[in-house]
Amino acid sequence: MAEIGIFVGTMYGNSLLVAEEAEAILTAQGHKATVFEDPELSDWLPYQDKYVLVVTSTTGQGDLPDSIVPLFQGIKDSLGFQPNLRYGVIALGDSSYVNFCNGGKQFDALLQEQSAQRVGEMLLIDASENPEPETESNPWVEQWGTLLS
C-alpha cells in the first residue's frame, strides 16, 4: 500500500479536521498516512517519490493560510522538478469570494509546474454550501485512496 503525507493549511481548523478524517480513512484502507499540521519543507522531502495530499483553506484575497506558506515557498524556491511525486488536493473556500479555493489552486498550479502527477481531480469544497466539509471530503478520500498503488 501507499505512503501518504497529508499537508495542512488551516486558519480555523476545518482543513485540519478534513485531514484527520482523511488520515483515518486512508489508514483503514491499508495505507500509511501521516498528517503535518504546520508543514515545512523537511516534512515534504521524504514524500517526493511517494504520495502527498494537500488539504488547505483560502484566506484573505485568495491567499494560503500562514501555516502552509513556509512549505509552499520552500517547494517553490528549493525543489523545481518533482516528476516522481503523485498528489491530490482538497481545497476549502467560500464561493461568495472572488478567489474561491485559490489556496488549493495555487498549490495545484505549483506542483503542475514542477511536473508532479496529480491523482484524480482536485476537490473544491464550498463553505457557503457545505458547513461540514468532511461530509464532502470523506467520500472523495475513500475514492482517492483506491487510486493509489
From Swiss-Prot:
Domain of life: Bacteria
Transmembrane segments: none
GO MF terms, alphabetically ordered: FMN binding
One Pfam family here: Flavodoxin_1
Positions of the Flavodoxin-like domain: 4-145
Gene3D superfamilies, sorted: 3.40.50.360
Keyword Transport among UniProt keywords: yes
Residues where FMN binds: T10, M11, Y12, G13, N14, S15, N99, F100, C101
Keyword terms, alphabetized: Electron transport, Flavoprotein, FMN, Nucleotide-binding, Transport
Cofactor(s) required, per the database record: FMN
Cofactor stoichiometry and binding remark: Binds 1 FMN non-covalently.
Assembly and interaction partners: Monomer.
Described purpose of this protein according to its UniProt entry: Probable electron transporter.
NCBIfam families: PRK08105.1 (NF005989)
Family assignment from sequence similarity: Belongs to the flavodoxin family. MioC subfamily.
Domain notes: The structure is significantly stabilized upon cofactor binding.
Protein name in the entry: Flavodoxin YqcA
Annotated organism of origin: Escherichia coli (strain K12)
Encoding gene (name): yqcA
